């Protein structure tokens, strides 16, 4: 699986990389990770918006906890996309690694799933 831990990301603001938040629009408007090249394409709309995914640059998918972004990755790979990764643990692990977000995540996000900020366990 092509996953990347938030504490290993150091090049996410490069112009060649596109971050796609696959949460619903209302979630994205409330809070999101603080990176330059980010778009919101909800998992529920990916099939209708598949043409918005570039096939010539790396795409990193993110959601709240990694579940939807992993599903999106599998869906896109089945349709021929190859330059894909997803953020393991999603925004939860992003926050646990003290990385910046825009907006205010609810307290439950920062306390859900895991108290461990590392990945791969």
Describe the function of each predicted region:
Residues 62-63:
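Short, surface-exposed ligand- or partner-binding patches at beta-edge/loop junctions that are enriched
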Residues 1-18, 25-58, 67-121:
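Rhodanese-like catalytic fold shared by cysteine-dependent sulfurtransferases
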């Amino acid at each position: 699986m092509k996953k990347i831990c938030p504490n290993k990301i150091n090049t996410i603001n490069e112009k060649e990389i596109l971050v796609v938040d696959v949460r619903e629009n209302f979630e994205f408007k409330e809070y999101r990770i603080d990176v330059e090249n980010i778009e919101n394409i909800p998992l529920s709309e990916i099939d209708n918006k598949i043409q918005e995914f570039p096939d010539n640059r790396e795409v990193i998918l993110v959601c709240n906890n990694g579940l939807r972004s992993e599903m999106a990755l599998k869906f896109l790979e089945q349709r021929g996309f190859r330059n894909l990764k997803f953020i393991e643990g999603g925004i939860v692990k992003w926050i646990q690694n003290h990385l910046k977000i825009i907006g205010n995540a609810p307290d439950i996000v920062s306390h859900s799933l895991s108290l461990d900020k590392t990945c791969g366990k």
